């Protein structure tokens, strides 16, 4: 009996040691454990915060360690790593425009906007809406007319766009802008360059009118604004940039200190309207005037608007084109 008891006592001691180790180190989870497997909501939330704090501490320790190593090496320290972003990891597009390319210069001299850039025409814009627009869409159109010089707001009254376009051409308009709405909110824009096109269709989102903006400036003056176009690098983006540029007069009136910005980032075009505030000879600030909104290109059509027989240069096909987050078209 004594020979049998010895191994049993050793096993009991081993089990006690294991239990003590477990209690000291906290609960042990299997290697494939996930916080989402905890059914109790309060415990799950507590465990999530605990894991998040542990990750933060490890990250800070690693950061301090790297900082000490860099300080010790001084001039011999390796160069800092550039953070990876979707922009600098972008997949190269073969249609990226080189401004010095002769083919690009020839296309610019013969495309639909050449008359504007050769100063043969002055922009004149007609802004209209879908049928029976609501108050928010009407106010949005009125504010757009204060941003774009020589812009006039007219209401459709049930007329088809195919009948509106010939009337615009006969009255000397160079652009037709149609603001569509859904559930009383502006959600689309059709921008048609006259008389030869092209026609672009955009999705409109994140519309903020002037009254909805904090710390906005006074209403814009009638001075022609400066136009800034950012990150329109491909052939398609170049065409869209020229489409926006031709909305505004050739020579900005810098006395008004107003600037309209179309900033392309990940194929979203952010529009902002600012006024420069000069504090002294060296310092300058900007004051947003509004409105602000975001555009997403849906299609680009050759010629004027024709929903049935129009020839499309580019159409956004979401499931085919958005397979990679690092692929951009503008």
UniProtKB/Swiss-Prot annotation:
Bias (Basic and acidic residues) ranges: 71-83
Pfam families, per database record: Brix (PF04427)
GO cellular component, one term: nucleolus
Biased composition (Basic residues): 55-70
Domain of life: Eukaryota
InterPro entries (alphabetical): Brix, IMP4/RPF1
Cellular location(s): Nucleus, Nucleolus
Molecular functions (GO terms): RNA binding; rRNA primary transcript binding
Biological processes per GO annotation: maturation of 5.8S rRNA; maturation of LSU-rRNA
Region annotation (Disordered) ranges: 1-32, 53-83
Domain Brix, residue spans: 123-306
Keywords attached to this entry: Nucleus, Ribosome biogenesis, RNA-binding, rRNA processing, rRNA-binding
Region (RNA-binding): 284-301
PANTHER family in alphabetical order: RIBOSOME PRODUCTION FACTOR 1 (PTHR22734:SF3), U3 SMALL NUCLEOLAR RIBONUCLEOPROTEIN PROTEIN IMP4 (PTHR22734)
Functional description taken from the UniProt entry: May be required for ribosome biogenesis.
Name of protein: Ribosome production factor 1
Species, as recorded: Danio rerio (Zebrafish)
